[in-house]
Amino acid sequence: MPRTVRMRPRKNKSQALKVDKGCRKGRTYEDFLKFMEENPDSVVCEGDSVEGVKGGKVLLTLFFVQQNLQLAFLRNYNDSRSVTEIFERLYIELRPDIFGKIFDVLLLDNGSEFSNPQALEFDAQGNRRLRVFYCDPSSPYQKGGCENN
């Protein structure tokens, strides 16, 4: 029997999305710790993406640390635009005053889907909605509540 019948053809490698490393300036985990020392009453929300099949639908999970509550939003693609659209929708539906009380600080990993912090932090008029901080690479323990649920 020919060997080609038994083996599947090789898949081409997909091009990885490049993450702008400049977006992390002033948003590192050390900056997060400093901010929390200055603002201990801030509501912290940890965000992460849960992928199933590559190229398939993706979950955006938001874990509220103080409330021990986790929300999940289904996205069609694992890109920055889909994350921004979810926060835009929440901002409109909850109204700015309620959104500001619920989402104060957002702690994220270094995924390409979170590489546009300006769109998350500010609304269309330039008003600050929340503050975005990033965990260090390969440090899932820094947002342990989100990773364990």
Where are these regions (language model features)?
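Mobile genetic element proteins and their domesticated derivatives, centered on retroelements
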Residues: 48, 62, 68, 87, ...
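RNase H-like two-metal-ion nuclease catalytic core shared by retroviral integrases
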Residues: 108-110, 132-149
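Short, surface-exposed basic-aromatic patches at helix termini and helix-loop junctions that form
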Residues: 118-130
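Long, charged, low-complexity intrinsically disordered regions
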Residues: 23, 27-30, 43, 74, ...
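Short conserved beta-strand segments at catalytic cores or DNA/RNA-binding microdomains
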Residues: 37, 48-50, 54-71
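Active-site beta-loop-alpha junctions of metal-dependent nucleic acid enzymes
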Residues: 52-55, 72-97
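Acidic/histidine-rich, metal-coordinating catalytic segments
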Residues: 48, 100-116, 138
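Basic, flexible linker segments flanking DNA-binding modules
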Residues: 1-37
